[in-house]
UniProtKB/Swiss-Prot annotation:
Its main location: cytoplasm. Both the N-terminal core domain and the C-terminal headpiece domain are sufficient for binding to F-actin and necessary for actin bundling activity. PROSITE patterns: HP (PS51089). This is Dematin. GO terms for biological process: actin cytoskeleton organization; actin filament bundle assembly; actin filament capping; cellular response to cAMP; endoplasmic reticulum tubular network organization; erythrocyte development; lamellipodium assembly; negative regulation of cell-substrate adhesion.
Length: 406
């Protein structure tokens, strides 16, 4: 009877639950004993941390299970009192049926209650997973990455089983999945992104390329010297063969054939400039050399009459034929006169407002002043055709209106 009246011993920070049998494991009835005081679960949060309290788990994370060390007499006398003592960081699994049978038998009361009264901690299985540590390579955190494991495993084999995956892994090591060009200077590698190559590396590369270019130029000059010697020898042979031919016609034919067989070798740096601006400039000056003096200045300024505005032809009245006339063919004139423009007296070219006057055939209605002779032109406009061509378009039109030529 002393054993029945004896209260169960608990640790200083133990949690005991007075639960109803109908509701096993209810968190609302959990209490904790500390310094001979019974504390509810809500009061545990107000306890300062410097108290000597063992680890008390939250009720929603605790495993509630009946203790298996009580006897039949305890079940009769105390039907609703159950205890559960928690040792630090330890939980107990549910007992097996054999243990239940031994604990319920009356002969095992002292044996079952003896370890409980002693208060020794119980060993239990952990509620979380531990990785296997039997093998040294079982820890996944100490293993190399997967692609390195595959590279090590397939490194000895001549052909990989997954060439596409290996190619992707290999290309992922380079920025933009492009390996660097071995001919280019290496870039500076940082933690963020590869920087441009250093100036020292660029300078050395530039010096190497410059030296290689100098060597190539020297080789080219040597080849030119060799070719010059070959040309001299070939010319000497030609002279010997020409001296053997007696007839003049045979000499001419043989000379032409030999000139065709000569290798045409020219350096690009010795060739003249062939840019469009250069050619158009030279073409403009060559064309204007055969023209009169008053038309040469405007043509050299415009360089070509094909791209001049509609009034540019009026600036050069001396363009009588040639390229200037061909440039006006695409401006709507039906039948341009390729030959020299005809000269008419001033009275035949006058335009009046009274009625539509008949102009001579083949006359340009927009440039009637070109059909005037030099004497009539100076008499009507009081200036030379060269001075008239230097005036602005609106000024020329005003003068032509006054002279009834517009």
């Amino acid at each position: 009877m002393e054993r029945l009246q004896k209260q169960p011993l608990t640790s200083p920070g133990s949690v005991s639950s007075s639960r109803d049998s109908s509701v096993p494991g209810s968190p609302s009835s959990i209490v904790a004993k500390m310094d001979n005081q019974v504390l509810g679960y809500k009061d545990l949060a107000a306890i300062p941390k410097d108290k000597a309290i063992l680890d008390i788990e939250r009720p929603d994370l605790m495993i509630y299970e009946p203790h298996f060390t009580y006897s039949l007499l305890e079940h009769v006398e105390l039907p609703r009192s159950r205890e559960r003592s928690l040792s630090p960081k330890s939980t107990s699994p549910p007992p097996s049926p054999e243990v239940w049978a031994e604990s319920r038998s009356p002969g095992t009361i002292s044996q079952a209650s003896a370890p409980r009264t002693a208060g020794t901690p119980r060993t239990s299985l952990p509620h979380f997973h531990h990785p296997e540590t039997t093998r040294p390579d079982s820890n996944i955190y100490k293993k190399p990455p997967i692609y390195k494991q595959r590279a090590e495993s397939t490194g000895g084999s001549p052909q990989s089983k997954h060439p596409i995956e290996d190619l992707i892994i290999e290309s992922s090591k380079f920025p933009a999945a492009q390996p660097p060009d071995p001919n280019q200077p290496a870039k500076i590698e940082t933690d963020y992104w590869p920087c441009p190559p250093s100036l020292a590396v660029v300078e050395t590369e530039w010096r190497k390329r410059k030296a290689s270019r100098r060597g190539a130029e020297e080789e080219e000059e040597e080849e030119d010297d060799d070719s010059g010697e070959e040309m001299k020898a070939l010319r000497e042979r030609q002279r010997e063969e020409l001296s053997k031919v007696t007839s003049n016609l045979g000499k001419m034919i043989l000379k032409e054939e030999m000139e065709k067989s000569l290798p045409i070798r020219r350096k690009t740096r010795s060739l003249p400039d062939r840019t469009p601006f250069h050619t158009s400039l030279h073409a403009g000056t060559s064309k204007s050399s055969s023209l009169p003096a008053y038309g040469r200045t405007t043509l050299s300024r415009l360089q070509s009459t094909d791209f001049s505005p509609s009034g540019s032809e009026a600036e050069s009245p001396g363009l009588q034929n040639g390229e200037g006339q061909r440039g006006r063919m695409d401006r709507g004139n039906s039948l341009p006169c390729v030959l020299e423009q005809k000269i008419y007296p001033y009275e035949m070219l006058v335009v009046t407002n009274r009625g539509r006057t008949k102009l001579p055939p083949g006359v340009d209605r927009m440039r009637l002043e070109r059909h005037l002779s030099a004497e009539d032109f100076s008499r009507v406009f009081s200036m030379s055709p060269e001075e008239f061509g230097k005036l602005a378009l609106w000024k020329r039109n005003e003068l032509k209106k006054k002279a009834s030529l517009f």
